[in-house]
């Protein structure tokens, strides 16, 4: 049973697709941009009263590309008001 769950997860796993804005091997900027895009989208949709689920694509991409420690640090910085990005 557990083996089937793992196989299903592997089969359904999707990583970040190619983005022509970031053609180089180093994907740091891609990670950063998708993190910002997710939170900008979430903020805009919340303000307009729209469906926030349309922003999930950005979240999946940055979670696929970014190291967990970076995301944790950025989330803490946003909570403290010291995040350097413009959201």
Swiss-Prot record:
Annotated CHCH domain ranges read 28-74
Which InterPro entries does this chain map to?
COX6B-like, CX6/COA6-like_sf, Cyt_c_oxidase_su6B
Spell out the Gene3D superfamilies in the cross-references: Cytochrome c oxidase, subunit VIb
What are the record's GO terms for cellular component? mitochondrial inner membrane; mitochondrial intermembrane space; mitochondrion; respiratory chain complex IV
Where does this chain mainly localize? mitochondrion
| Swiss-Prot/TrEMBL keywords | Disulfide bond, Mitochondrion
Q: Where in the cell is it found?
A: Mitochondrion intermembrane space
Where is the motif (Cx10C motif)? 55-66
Disulphide bonds annotated for this chain are 31-66, 41-55
* Residue window of motif Cx9C motif: 31-41
Q: Which CDD domains match?
A: Cyt_c_Oxidase_VIb
Its function, per the record, reads: Connects the two COX monomers into the physiological dimeric form.
Q: What is this protein called?
A: Cytochrome c oxidase subunit 6B1
Mind giving the lineage of the organism this protein is from? Eukaryota, Metazoa, Chordata, Craniata, Vertebrata
Q: In the UniProt record, what gene is named as encoding this protein?
A: COX6B1
């Amino acid at each position: 049973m557990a083996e089937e769950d793992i196989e299903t997860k592997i089969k359904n796993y999707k990583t970040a697709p190619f983005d022509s804005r970031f053609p180089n091997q180093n994907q740091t900027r891609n990670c950063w941009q998708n993190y910002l895009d997710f939170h900008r989208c979430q903020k805009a949709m919340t303000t307009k009263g729209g469906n926030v689920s349309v922003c999930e694509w950005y979240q999946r991409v940055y979670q696929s590309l970014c190291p967990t420690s970076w995301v944790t640090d950025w989330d803490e910085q946003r909570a403290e008001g010291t995040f350097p990005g413009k959201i």
